[in-house]
């Protein structure tokens, strides 16, 4: 079942607990029956057959609970492993990552990209990698971990990030202490205006070059975000942030319609869920208020959106 991102309370944690509990219960029933009760049933059958002077005959019918457990255990165990350690589906319910991700996109998140974690307590079991600049990541919202957010990694640990006049500036971490990188604007190339409309305004589309990743962003032509509303880090200006070790600075691609690190700070490594790698299907939900069908019923399928996420 796909979980919504940035759309309200998430049932993912409860679903994981239910999956783990069902896997343990059905597996335990199957195991106990195989080791304890199945041999007893066969012994009774053999004794009855010997008394009648016949062979073993047919196996006795399994108890309903055992039969059900044997049938569903492999299925839910497979789902548990797939969802907890490999890939998990999510639904995009908001436009904060437009134009990269649209409302109605269903995406796959690679759960093992930044470490293998246990499905209940989310403690890291195996190190597999760290986010790179430009990755689109799903994470637990630091201010309310029951909610999953999706944003793009802009600042890595040790980086200095400045956001001024809708422009992102980055000074990468100085690794050696000599010839340290300087603060530079992230290159932007204007693409078009008018494909997306918000608040009656035609949004401007740019291509942003983060060095290893090129991706498109949207800007509102009029709306300005005051630094007064930004998260203030002690010792820095209101529009400047120094990314702490083990944390990340993230932004939405729809820059003037996204609540991200500018407003609430950094994403700890422990909050990372995984890397968004693909759109597997995309639905349109464009119903008028007078339509008799509920709003969650799709009005169309955007097959052309299926593919990798960049």
Task: Please report, for each region that a protein language model flagged, where it lies by residue.
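Soluble "head" domains of membrane/secretory-pathway proteins
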Residues: 5-8, 12-40, 49-53, 57-65, ...
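Internal/C-terminal transmembrane anchor helices
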Residues: 51-87
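Short surface loop/edge beta-strand patches of beta-sandwich-type extracellular domains
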Residues: 95
């Amino acid at each position: 079942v796909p979980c919504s991102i940035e759309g309200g309370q998430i049932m993912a944690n409860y679903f994981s607990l239910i999956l783990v509990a069902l896997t343990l219960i059905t597996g335990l029933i199957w195991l106990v029956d195989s080791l304890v009760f199945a041999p007893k049933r066969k012994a009774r059958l053999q004794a009855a057959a010997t008394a009648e002077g016949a062979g073993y005959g047919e196996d006795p019918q399994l108890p309903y609970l055992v039969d059900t457990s044997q049938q569903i255990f492999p299925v839910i165990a497979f789902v548990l492993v797939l969802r907890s350690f490999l890939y998990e589906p999510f639904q995009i319910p908001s436009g904060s990552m437009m134009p990269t991700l649209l409302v109605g996109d269903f995406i796959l998140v690679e759960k093992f990209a930044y470490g293998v974690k246990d499905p209940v307590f989310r403690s890291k079991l195996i190190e597999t990698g760290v986010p790179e600049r430009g990755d689109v990541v799903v994470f637990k919202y630091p201010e309310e971990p029951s909610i999953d957010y999706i944003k793009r990694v802009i600042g890595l640990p040790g980086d200095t990030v400045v956001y001024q006049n809708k422009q992102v500036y980055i000074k990468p971490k100085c690794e050696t202490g000599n010839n340290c990188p300087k603060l530079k604007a992230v290159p932007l190339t204007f693409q078009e205006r008018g494909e997306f409309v918000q608040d009656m305004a035609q949004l401007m589309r740019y291509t942003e070059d983060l060095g290893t990743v090129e991706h498109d962003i949207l800007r509102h032509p009029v709306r300005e975000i005051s630094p007064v509303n930004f998260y203030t880090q002690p010792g820095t200006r209101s529009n400047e942030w120094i990314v702490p070790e083990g944390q990340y600075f993230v932004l939405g691609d729809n820059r003037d319609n996204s609540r991200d690190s500018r407003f609430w700070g950094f994403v700890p490594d422990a909050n990372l869920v995984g890397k968004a790698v693909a759109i597997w299907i995309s639905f349109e939900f464009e119903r008028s208020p007078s339509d008799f069908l509920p709003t969650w019923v799709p009005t169309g399928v955007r097959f052309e959106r299926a593919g990798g996420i960049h």
